[in-house]
A protein has these predicted regions:
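Ribonuclease/tRNase effector modules and their secretory precursors
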Residues: 1-230
Length: 230
């Protein structure tokens, strides 16, 4: 199947199961809205289902309660995913927002690099969780990076970018409604140049959020970064 055909098939499944996912989501959210008189067992803070579509695709659904937001709203994340078997490995398709169609495709190459460059060096015990799920659960802070390689073509600039998170850099490609994770670069194993990209990304991110009282401190960080450039 081509990328377009995969997206079309995912969209058909999305239209078929989104209402069921939303109903299950609301039911789980309601069960988590508890008063201070009640306590929840750890195992009950998540819930899993499987949904089979008319196309005989079996989607896995996982809801996780992560607490309350500062304004008192309950915070629950949804992971809706399916394995996509390819000739060179198994990719994973995610449709994590039942209210909006968007596909995130985690490639087998990305997962291999994520394992080699982060999970194994860090000694992460997945406790039975698939690496693709672990990545989604532990990189919710990922955001688009400012950095773009100077040797990228116009086509690459239109389709690709880097996402930066606490665990490292993810190279992604956006085509239609599908975001594909191509490869992973762990901050601890980057070259000195790429490591500095991560530092600069964090600086620029902080600059975007900074108050006037923070600017002098951030300017000092900027001078240090510039001084480190060879």
């Amino acid at each position: 199947m081509t990328e377009e055909e995969i997206e079309q098939a995912a969209y058909k499944d999305y239209l078929e199961i989104r209402t069921r996912v939303q109903i299950a989501f609301e039911r789980f959210a309601q069960s988590m809205r508890i008063s201070g008189k009640h306590k929840r067992a750890i195992h009950s803070l998540s819930e899993s289902h499987t949904l089979c579509t008319q196309a005989r695709n079996t989607w896995n659904v996982n809801f996780r309660y992560t607490g309350y937001t500062p304004d008192g709203k309950i915070n629950i994340v949804c992971y809706l995913y399916i394995p996509l078997r390819r000739e060179n490995g198994v990719d994973y398709l995610f449709m994590n927002d039942p209210k909006c169609f968007k596909v995130e495709r985690v490639s087998s190459h990305f997962l291999q690099r994520y394992k080699e460059r982060y999970l194994d060096p860090a000694g992460i015990d997945l406790k039975g969780v698939h690496p693709a799920i672990y990545f989604m659960q532990n990189n919710e802070d990922r955001r688009q990076a400012y950095y773009l390689p100077k040797n990228w073509t116009d086509e690459e600039l239109a389709e690709k970018c880097f996402l930066v998170s606490g665990q490292g850099l993810s190279l992604i490609k956006l085509c239609g409604k599908t975001l594909t994770y191509i490869t992973f670069l762990d901050q601890e194993n980057l070259s000195r140049y790429k490591a500095q990209v991560c530092e600069e990304e964090e600086y620029l991110h902080l600059m975007g959020k900074a108050k006037d009282s923070d600017i002098l401190g951030l300017q000092a960080i900027s001078k240090k970064l510039c001084a480190d450039i060879e």
